[in-house]
């Protein structure tokens, strides 16, 4: 264990802001736990179909306020992207070279996931698994990939958006919601908010990289102002309280993003900035620093494969021939919640198996003289540029 800590420490560049690494680690843990807690695969109808405890227990909506951490991802992504592009320009790296390297790093682990699931889907269909079941599983696996598409687009636009004030995309989201909700406009307009909505925290991250957002007053303004605006939109404007999608709900705050999701993201960004000070004090011990670094090095693998891990456990559980509580049953009560909490360590163990099989696609190929290239994929990996980790 001590040797692992020393290796991770030696691979960590000096001067790194470990608080940013810790923010990213908290964000990825929130996404993984959030999906595991609000996604159920029910087997009560002869097929496998998705369900959510938020359908049956809407009072659990406040849990989504803690587990939906996408704004933090885009905040950190904007900070890392803007700083990385500025550093690349200082070294004489062209925009095409900088962007190409980042997109290649994003695409490598995604390609592995798509290839595995293309084969798995074909095998299931040949084996006679119903198309509805295969569709449910593929939807769970592929739906998180929208995040990477948006992130790749914002990364490509980094030189253009680094100087954009967040109020501009907020104004776009406001007008889109006003037209589609207030004036009965077409629902497809909401997809404009996919870019505009997540551009808000990305722009905040870019401002952070330029030296802004350093004072606590700004952070408190974002937190309190965003929270107050979100509360007002939920209480008096009819927006859903849940910050994650709920099957069967007429309106989703996240698919596509609404004004409530954007104001909630502002509050999250404010909270994240306020946490920077405490987070810089927490990883004072080498073991704690190594744990944060390890989560960051595995962030992309965890993001891409955590749903697969949950589905693998669900499939193995079906071999018992009965519906296991918290795994195959309808999420309609506190009994299901408690049972699902008990399954989390099993999901984590399955994710470790996925990590062992696929983390090399995230960390890159081994080079000469025993070195391995550790990939930095913007928001889903630690700060800085590619460096080499001595094996």
Summary of predicted features, one role per range:
Residues 2-391:
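Alpha-helical transmembrane segments and their immediate juxtamembrane cytosolic regions
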